[in-house]
Swiss-Prot record:
PANTHER family linked: 50S RIBOSOMAL PROTEIN L3, LARGE RIBOSOMAL SUBUNIT PROTEIN UL3C
Disulfide bonds: none
Keyword rRNA-binding: yes
Protein's recorded name: Large ribosomal subunit protein uL3
Pfam name, any one: Ribosomal_L3
Its biological purpose: One of the primary rRNA binding proteins, it binds directly near the 3'-end of the 23S rRNA, where it nucleates assembly of the 50S subunit.
Subunit structure: Part of the 50S ribosomal subunit. Forms a cluster with proteins L14 and L19.
One term of GO molecular function: structural constituent of ribosome
InterPro entries: Ribosomal_uL3, Ribosomal_uL3_bac/org-type, Ribosomal_uL3_CS, Transl_B-barrel_sf
HAMAP family reported for this sequence: Ribosomal_uL3_B (MF_01325_B)
Keyword terms of this UniProt record: Ribonucleoprotein, Ribosomal protein, RNA-binding, rRNA-binding
Residue segments, region Disordered: 132-152
Organism superkingdom: Bacteria
Length: 218
């Protein structure tokens, strides 16, 4: 990692659209409603053993917040929020409890990693879930066209190895897409236009933070 400070913000995925760049080329972008986030706690090396800031985002009915969590928000002097996430940072001097963060934490051209929950697909077979080829369509193949085939020997090893790719529930996993560029920051409307696709459904929670690979360039 470089000495460049890590930045991050929570937001909501609004969907995809396309815009034109300075050379009149079409650029596919994902629109993220970034923030506003509020800093509710600061972790320090001396007290907690690591440096991080705790960010809160999203409206919630105060009656749905339990007492310990409500007390934490009260101590920070902010109203309760729906989502709370910690962001590891090397230096917490730029943050203070109660501080509000908006889309302006990033600049045009910054490289970011985006984390979200992928779309749930339900129970899926091996061809859809793992990309298996399947079995032959003819030449004696009977009613097993989409079956996975053997999952292990009968006597040796006499068991199914851990990690065997099989049918099961697909999606709803935590996914991170790395090294995406911020095409444009719309500070007035609190929007980030991120080049390319990001994980999750429309309206889903996403975490946008400085790219890890190659050091933070934002």
């Amino acid at each position: 990692m470089t000495d460049t400070k890590i930045k991050g913000i929570l937001g909501t995925k609004l969907g995809m659209t396309q815009v034109f760049d300075e050379n009149n080329r079409v650029v596919p972008v994902t629109v993220v409603k970034a923030g506003p986030n509020v800093v509710t706690q600061i972790r320090t090396e001396e007290r907690d053993g690591y440096s991080a800031v705790q960010l809160a985002f999203g409206a919630i009915d105060p009656r749905k917040v339990n007492k310990p969590t409500s007390g934490q928000f009260t101590k920070a002097g902010v109203t309760p929020r729906r989502h709370v996430v910690e962001l590891r940072v090397a230096d917490t001097s730029d943050y203070e409890v109660g501080q509000e963060l908006t889309a302006e934490v990033f600049e045009d051209g910054a490289y970011v990693d985006v984390t979200g929950t992928s779309k749930g697909k339900g129970f899926a077979g091996t061809m859809k879930r793992h990309g298996f080829k399947g079995q032959g369509a003819s030449h004696g193949t009977q009613a097993v066209h989409r079956r996975p085939g053997s999952i292990g020997g009968c006597a040796t090893p006499g068991r199914v190895f851990k990690g065997m790719r099989m049918s099961g529930r697909m999606g709803s996993d935590r996914i991170t897409t790395q090294n995406l560029s911020v095409h444009k920051v719309d500070a007035e409307n609190g929007l980030l236009l991120i080049k390319g696709a990001i994980p999750g459904r429309k309206g889903g929670l996403v975490i946008v933070k400085s790219a890890v690979k190659g050091g933070a360039r934002a």
